[in-house]
C-alpha cells in the first residue's frame, strides 16, 4: 500500500505548484507587440537573433510556435527565420475589455527538446466609436426640483480600451443642465445630468438635449443620444429605495428564473402618484442576464451565468411613481464560481514512434488549463503506474512526457498511454486523452538458430542437388533488422571440399547435396552455417551441422577364399574316413557396406551329392554332414551362396571342388565346445598335457607313414596329406594366417593343448605344410623326400 502511494506521488504533478525548470527553457520571456488589424504576413521578429541561436539552427531543429488551443496567430518562416503574422488579429475578439491583451506562446525546438517563453501583445487601435444602448432617453422632472439634483443617465459602450476607449460625456448647450462623467468600480464611465436652474412647466414644459460620448482616439470618435425632458406639475415626493446599494451573490450554475434579489421602493404620495413600478436602468439587452418584476421588484435570472466570462454585474434599478418621478439604486451581483469546467489538455508536441535503447526520450509536450478559479482551477496530471514513462512539469502550465529509461521493443512494441487531468474542485472533474506510442526497432538482437546443432541424414548414391534438410534462425527484431541471410562458413578442416559437397539457400536455409555421396568414401562430416541479419551493423550467429551419410546396399559380397577370379579352382582333399562335422574348408567373404548391409550369411546352393556336405550359415565353414562311404563319388563340386542382409539383398557365389581320398586319415576337428569348467584341478591339466604330447607324436608318425605309402601307390597323386592344390595364382595378401579358420593353400590343422593352470583352456597349434609346386610327377616328388616328410610347426 505504501509503495503504491509513493508511485502515485511520483506520477502525479499538482498544477498549482508551478515549477519553472529554466534548465529547459529560456531564462526570460521574450515579448513582442503588434497592432490589431495588421495584415497577415507582417514581420514581427527574427527568432535567430532574439533567441541567440546559430544560423540555420531553428530550421534544423524543427522550430514551431505553439499557442494555447493550437491557434496559430504567428508563423515561422524556416528560410528567413522570421516570425510573421499568420492572420489579422482583432483585439476585441481575442481579449474583450481586458487590457493589456497579451497572448502567451512558446517556441518549441527539437533535438534536443527546448522551450522559449514568449508573448505577443495586441495593441488597440481606435476602430470603434462609443455607442449608447438607446438613441433616445426620456426624463420626467418635477418643476419644483431644486438645482443640484443629479439624474443618472444611461452610459455608452466603447469596445476599444485605454485611450481609445470612452473618455468623457458632453451635452448640448442649455441653461438648465450640465453633465458629469463618473467612473464605476470596474472602470467604466457613465454620465450624470445635473440640474443647474429650476424648471418652469408654464414657461417650457419640454426640453430636448443631445448627450455626446467621446473617446480618446486620434482623431476621436463619438456617439450621441437624444434626451427628452418632460417638466411635470407639482409632485412633492419621489420614490425612494430602502437601500441605495444592493449586493447579491449568485452561483453560476443557478437555474434560469431563479430569484436573485428583491428590491423595494416606496412613495409617500397618495393615489396614483404613490404607486411605484420597477425597471432596470442601464439595460444592455445583449449581455444583461437579469429581469425585474415591475410590480414586486423581484430580480430573476433570464440568462445563464458564467463565472469564466463575467465575474460580477453592476445593475441600476429605477423605481417610477404614477406621476413620472423616479428614484434609482445600484445592485452589485457577484457570480460565484462553481466547478463546472473540466480541465482542458492541449497537445503541442507528440512523437508516436520512438526508437528503443535510448535512455530518455521526450514523447509529448502538452499544456493543461481549467477555466474555473481558485481551488476549482488546481489540477493534477497523472498516467498509469505500470508504464515506463514519467510526467515532468515544464513551464507554467506545460508538461513533458518522457521515457523513464531505455525501452525494449522485443518486450513490448506498443504502449497505450492515458493522460488524466483532474481538478481539485467538488465534485472533481477530469479530462483524459489517450495516445499510442510505438517503439521502433533497433538492431540489437542477433539471429538465433532453433537448434545449436543439427544432425542431417542422407543416403548414399543420392541425386545431385538433393534437398537434404534445413536450418532455421529467427531474429527478435523487426523489419529489415529481422531479415536473415544464411551462408556456409569456411570449414575447420582445410581438406574438406565443402563447397563441392553442399550448398545452402541464402533466403530460407535449405541445404542441398551438390553431388552423389559415397558412404564407403565419406561416412560423415561437419560444417558450420551462419545466419546474418540485414541491420546496420549486421549481427550474426552460427550453428553446427553434422551430416551423416547412410549406407545403401550398393556392394555385393566379395569372396576372398576360395579365390573366384576365373582361374582354375583349388581342390580340397577329404579322407573318406572323416567323421560327420569334419571341416572341409571355410568360405571367407567381405562386404564393403556397413551395418546390416554387411551381415553375411552362407548357404549351400548346389552340390554334386545332396546331404553329404553342409555350410554353416554364419561363418561359412563347409563340413561333412555324414559318414563317407566307398559308394560316394570321389569328386564333388559345391556352390556356396554368400548373401548380405541388405534391402534388396546382394549375393555372390563361391565354387568348391572336393576330392575324397581313400585311406587318408586326418585329425578330427571338432565343433567348437564350451571351455572346461574353471573348477578342474591343476593336476588334471598336467595329465592332459602329457597325454596330448604323446598322442600328437603318435599321430604325426602315423601321418608320415601314411603319406609315404600313398605316394608309392599313387604315382598320379599331386600332393601328400591334406593340402590344397591351386591351379592358378593366389594372391598372398588374401591368405588367412590369423587363425580365423580359413584354409590357405597350405594344409592346416589345430593341435589342442591345455593352457596354464589358471585357465584350464585348450590351445591349438597349427602345423603348416609348405606349398608344393602346382605341377610335378611322382619322380620329382621322390627326389625331394625332405619335402614329403617335413612338417614344420609354427
From Swiss-Prot:
Single GO MF annotation: calcium ion binding
Extracellular side: 28-688
InterPro entries reported in the protein's UniProt record: Cadherin-like_dom, Cadherin-like_sf, Cadherin_C, Cadherin_CS, Cadherin_N, Protocadherin/Cadherin-CA
BP-aspect Gene Ontology terms: calcium-dependent cell-cell adhesion via plasma membrane cell adhesion molecules; cell adhesion; cell-cell recognition; chemical synaptic transmission; homophilic cell adhesion via plasma membrane adhesion molecules; nervous system development; synapse assembly
Keywords associated with the record: Calcium, Cell adhesion, Cell membrane, Disulfide bond, Glycoprotein, Membrane, Metal-binding, Repeat, Signal, Transmembrane, Transmembrane helix
UniProt key word Glycoprotein: yes
Compositionally biased region (Polar residues): 784-794
Region: Disordered, residue numbers: 773-794
Membrane topology according to the record: Single-pass type I membrane protein
Membrane-spanning intervals of the chain: 689-709
Subcellular location: Cell membrane
UniProt domain Cadherin: residue ranges: 34-132, 137-241, 246-345, 350-449, 454-559, 566-669
Glycosylated residues (UniProt): 46, 183, 416, 565
Main localization, broad class: membrane
Cytoplasmic-side segments: 710-794
Signal peptide start and end residues: 1-27
Comment, domains: Cadherin 1 to cadherin 4 domains mediate homophilic trans-interaction, the interaction with an identical protocadherin expressed by a neighboring cell. This is a head-to-tail interaction, the cadherin 1 domain interacting with the cadherin 4 domain and the cadherin 2 domain interacting the cadherin 3 domain of the other protocadherin. The cadherin 6 domain mediates promiscuous interactions with protocadherins on the same cell membrane. Each cadherin domain binds three calcium ions.
Name of the protein in question: Protocadherin beta-6
